[in-house]
Amino acid sequence: MDQEALLVGRTLLKRGIPTIPFILASQALEKLAYFGLVPNMILFLTVEYGMGTAEAANILFLWSAATNFFPLVGAFIADSYTGRFPLIGFGSSISLTGMVLLWLTTIIRPECDKLTNVCQPTTLLKSVLLYSFFALTAIGAGGVRSSCLAFAADQLQPNQTSRVTTSSLETLFNWYYFSVMVACFLSQSLLVFVQTTYGWQIGFGVSVAAMALSVALFFAASPYYVRFQKPTRNSRNPWKLCRVQQVEDLKSLINVIPIWSTGIILSLVTACQVSFIVLQAKTMDRHTFIQGFEIPPGSYGIFLVISFLLFLGLYDLVIVPLLSWALREPFRLGVMVRMWAGYVISVLCISALAATEYARRKTARDESGTKLSAMWLLPYMILGGIAEALNTIAQNEFFYSELPKTMSSVATTLSSLNMAAASLISSWIITIVDVTTYGSWITENIDEGHLDYYYWLLVGLSLLNVLYFVWCKKSYGKCSI
């Protein structure tokens, strides 16, 4: 037994474990490249392609929905047909190709009339390149994000039948999410600054370089990866034989769907308003206490990330220990309580944004020419980060504990499905609002529109969502955690 354990340890030290940093670094660089494009994309579409605000927002919502939905498809393909390594390699290469196509749109000069010197905002070729970028990066995300974390966990196993210790998995997950958050921080600060200061060509070029490095790092360690064989013929289509266990798994999934659906509005309130916030920040006073320095419009989302991280640290390291000491017994908020608190805070969050937009528009239309400070966006960012920290982690704990162990991979992808559904619903709401208000709420010049009315509509939906969650909680009954 000791010789077998020693052999297993040697196998992991030679092959699997040393490759984990390559996988995590590759994943972090993919996130850096992708999220570095997101904040300013609304400006790129409206300025370089001459799109209206509503049209550009709809395109970005659909792109976000596809990017968050395809990982579920990728997970099914990897588990049933291809295995994880080929799918990650394919997804990374496809994403890189898409980003190169986007970068090419910044090189192609617009067609200009020599007499009038009037230039067309876009051409057919540039439009084809743009939409190809959206399609390829969405498909690529399905390959990379569906399998990267699971493939890293595979490196802790010398063979397909061995088990991974809980402490090893916890360490891996901690490093994974830490690397992702660092990538998000850098993308919304460094990359957005480069785009704002040096232009689209250099800014998008940095994302291409980061994605190219991601692909290179992933394939660099390919001879040393632990790779499990793809499923056999008998296991390729397991749903052809509908066993009792599979029926029970399906019942468990159906039971948690109502609770899952309550998270859609929260994602709509926090993550789906990034594009509009960039447009707001662009028209506000972004000066800081550092003389001569302005925060780029696309970088304000970084405050939501900081709020998320700070609240998590404060909750785990200060609030819980202090309350446990005061009560003289272990203190812990249940998942349902944390979800409810997240939904209540989301109402305050979007209300703060609506009030800020009302004040911003009123100040902008004032003939004095003054601008409202962009720091008034911080209440929305801070409350949004707290709401996400409370709700997202609680939902993940709930799904992981309530669904059978055979559905652990499904449990970890439900959060991304929330974002996909929220992006689709956002697109529908924007379309309906734009049609019913005859374009008077969401306009190309937001000073002339009523973006605050749109936000108050989201406040109403958030209030209804709180009531809906209470009903779902009562219907579900008592959960195991």
Swiss-Prot record:
CDD domains xrefs: MFS_NPF1_2
Gene Ontology terms: cellular component: membrane
Residue stretches spanning the membrane: 32-52, 57-77, 88-108, 124-144, 173-193, 202-222, 259-279, 302-322, 333-353, 374-394, 422-442, 451-471
Matching SUPFAM superfamilies: MFS general substrate transporter
Classification via InterPro entries: MFS_trans_sf, POT_fam
Gene Ontology molecular function: any one: transmembrane transporter activity
Organism domain of life: Eukaryota
Membrane topology listed for this record: Multi-pass membrane protein
Pfam families found in the cross-reference section: PTR2
Keywords: Membrane, Transmembrane, Transmembrane helix, Transport
Main location: membrane
Gene3D superfamilies to which the protein is assigned, alphabetical: MFS general substrate transporter like domains
Annotated tissue distribution: Expressed in roots.
Subcellular location per the Swiss-Prot or TrEMBL entry: Membrane
Family of this protein: Belongs to the major facilitator superfamily. Proton-dependent oligopeptide transporter (POT/PTR) (TC 2.A.17) family.
PANTHER family xrefs: OLIGOPEPTIDE TRANSPORTER-RELATED
Full protein name: Protein NRT1/ PTR FAMILY 1.3
Organism: Arabidopsis thaliana
